[in-house]
């Protein structure tokens, strides 16, 4: 089957993927009927490229197979392509044109997906499968954009990252890559996420909060001999849920999700441990909110803040429809890559669902839109 063949190819890469640029193409070996011209494929059929990418499982931590695939094909197209080491066998893919190795505009998105893997399928109007809109359809659109522009003598970069769905580690490493002295020239970063081709005015931030309670185990028949951690945690969470949150008249309210609660050992044991993971979507600075959370949670629990991605206002392009991204992206970790813009095909409302899809028409329109934006940005004075 199509999906089985491509998974086998990337999980057991032959010489083409091990030897780097200029090698025989994986596509030639596995899809001779489709591979008469990879250039025609990405210019004419982003649908096919999207399906190929979706059919390579790349749940966060396992991005190497799809990274190898993209690296090999971008090399074959003639791009100067590098694997930017992240950790273990994980790497980002960065591609530029030999004619202009330090592009002013770079298109970026992520290669990883949330679980579980769902292979691709399609009907007349949609492509389905895990990552179809978040964000493998966007990868296909950005590669097609770079090729279309290159045929017009306009050169942009492509930056495909690992780990966005988990901790943005790939973005952090990409930022350090430039900080370590690698020349860029990048003035604008066009980050792709599913915004239905609307350009984002702003992106909400993320504040992850861990609330932990400890107690003392005892037989449940003698609760007075123990101390229930769950009895400490539940009131703290109840107070946090009732706590007023800040709001922005343009962006909307800060929101809270209690995403995970765990604790206890058995129904007949007084629990000595309880824990909750919370996620706040920020609409401004977190400084006052952090203090409010600590005070509201109280002194019977421990509160920590393991992750924050700040709220951002973003550059827009006049004449394009706008939206507010209530989700977070890699952008806060890519500060060395120029002024950020955020848009892409697909709807965030179906991302991470078992029915994830991308509209074929929206995919095609995004290539036109990305090309227009790149040209507009390149016209801006330095």
Model regions: which residues?
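Acidic-glycine-rich active-site phosphate/pyrophosphate-binding loop
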Residues: 111-123, 185-186, 202-212
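Acidic/histidine-rich catalytic neighborhood of metal-dependent amide-processing enzymes
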Residues: 140-208, 248-249
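Metal-dependent amide/peptide-bond hydrolase catalytic core
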Residues: 82-83, 194, 201-202, 208-382
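A cross-taxon signal for low-complexity, glycine/charged-rich
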Residues: 3-4, 9-14, 19-23, 27, ...
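Short beta-strand segments
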Residues: 108-109, 159-161, 189-193, 212-214, ...
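Secretory-pathway/membrane protein signature
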Residues: 16, 32-43, 52, 77-78, ...
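Acidic/His- and Gly-rich active-site-bordering loop/insert found
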Residues: 40-132, 342
């Amino acid at each position: 089957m199509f999906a089985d063949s491509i998974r086998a190819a990337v999980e057991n890469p032959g010489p083409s993927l091990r030897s780097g640029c200029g090698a025989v193409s994986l596509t030639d070996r596995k899809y001779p009927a489709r591979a008469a011209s990879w250039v025609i494929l990405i210019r004419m059929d982003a649908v096919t490229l999207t399906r190929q990418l979706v059919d390579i499982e790349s749940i966060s931590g396992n991005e190497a197979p799809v990274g190898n695939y993209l690296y090999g094909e971008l090399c074959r197209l003639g791009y100067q392509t590098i694997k930017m080491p992240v950790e273990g066998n994980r790497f980002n893919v960065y591609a530029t044109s030999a004619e202009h190795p330090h592009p002013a505009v770079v298109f970026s998105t992520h290669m990883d997906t949330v679980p579980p893997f769902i292979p691709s399928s399609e009907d007349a109007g949609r492509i389905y499968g895990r990552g179809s809109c978040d964000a493998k359809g966007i990868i296909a659109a950005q590669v097609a954009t770079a090729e279309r522009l290159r045929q017009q003598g306009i050169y942009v970069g492509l930056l495909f990252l690992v780990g966005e769905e988990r901790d943005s580690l790939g973005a952090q490493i990409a930022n350090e890559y430039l900080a370590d002295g690698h020349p860029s020239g990048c003035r604008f970063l066009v980050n792709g996420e599913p915004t239905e081709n609307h350009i984002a005015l702003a992106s909400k931030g993320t504040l992850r909060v861990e609330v932990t309670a400890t107690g003392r185990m005892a037989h449940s028949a003698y609760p007075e001999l123990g101390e229930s951690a769950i009895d400490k945690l539940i009131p703290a969470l109840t107070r946090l849920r009732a706590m007023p949150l800040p709001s922005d008249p343009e962006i909307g309210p800060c929101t809270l999700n209690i995403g995970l609660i765990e604790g206890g050992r058995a129904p007949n044991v007084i629990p000595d441990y309880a824990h909750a993971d919370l996620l706040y979507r920020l609409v401004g600075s977190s400084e006052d909110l952090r203090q409010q959370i600590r005070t509201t949670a109280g002194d019977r629990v421990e509160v920590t803040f393991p992750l924050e991605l700040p709220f951002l206002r973003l550059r827009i392009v006049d004449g394009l429809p706008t939206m507010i991204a209530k989700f977070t992206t890699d952008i806060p970790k890519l500060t060395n890559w120029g002024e950020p813009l955020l848009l892409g095909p697909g709807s965030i409302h179906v991302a991470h669902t078992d029915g994830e899809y991308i509209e074929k028409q929206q995919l095609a329109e995004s290539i036109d839109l990305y090309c227009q934006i790149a040209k507009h940005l390149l016209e801006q004075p330095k």
